[in-house]
A protein has these predicted regions:
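Structural preference for beta-rich elements and adjacent junctions enriched in aromatics
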Residues: 24-177
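Bacterial N-terminal signal peptides
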Residues: 9-22
Length: 177
């Protein structure tokens, strides 16, 4: 069984494309430490543009997102390299997009048709934000979904692990594989 998803980013990933993902059981512990064996076979994204503030500039520091999925949902591992003294790891209330903290996240168009996407963001301090994006510019932060995340700071990098269950949002029936 394969699912087709369109991924695009509200904050880190700034492009959209379709990928086909095979379904198999994974053993990833959401603890912010990307040391689980299943991460070694993950798909990777490494091309990003700065979107906050909106400049589309190349990022100053290396970033990578690892992607895995199984019958339960999707797993994302973020590697964000930057000097330790510059990492803003302040905790803040849920859905506070204006908080003074370093954040990384993504938005998923579960139907792959464009009008609606679900956003998931985690700060370096472990605070979360989620919302529904409609028509690319309308955001509703009243949607509080049940998903897992954890962060870890080590040396000159901070890490995020996320698990987003398939049941988190309604999806249209998919035709084909």
């Amino acid at each position: 069984m394969h699912r087709k998803l369109s991924f695009f980013s509200a904050f880190v990933l700034t492009f959209s494309f379709f990928i086909s993902l095979p379904i198999y059981a994974l053993d990833i512990k959401i603890d912010g430490v990307l040391d689980d064996a299943d991460w070694s076979s993950a798909r990777e994204w490494t091309k990003y543009y700065e979107s906050m503030p909106f400049s589309l500039a190349e990022p100053k520091h290396y970033q990578k997102v690892l992607i895995q999925e199984d019958e339960k949902g999707m797993y994302f591992g973020f590697i964000n390299e930057q000097p330790r003294e510059s990492i803003r790891s302040n905790r803040h209330e849920r859905d506070n997009e204006m908080a003074n903290a370093d954040k990384a996240g993504l938005a998923i168009d579960f139907d792959g048709d464009g009008p609606t996407a679900y956003g998931f963001t985690v700060s370096a301090g472990g605070s979360i934000s989620d919302g529904i994006y409609r028509n690319e510019n309308e955001v509703n932060y009243d949607w509080d979904a049940d998903w897992d995340s954890a962060t870890h700071i080590e040396g000159d990098a901070w890490f995020i692990e996320m698990f987003i269950p398939w049941s988190i949002a309604p999806m249209k029936s998919q035709k084909g594989d």
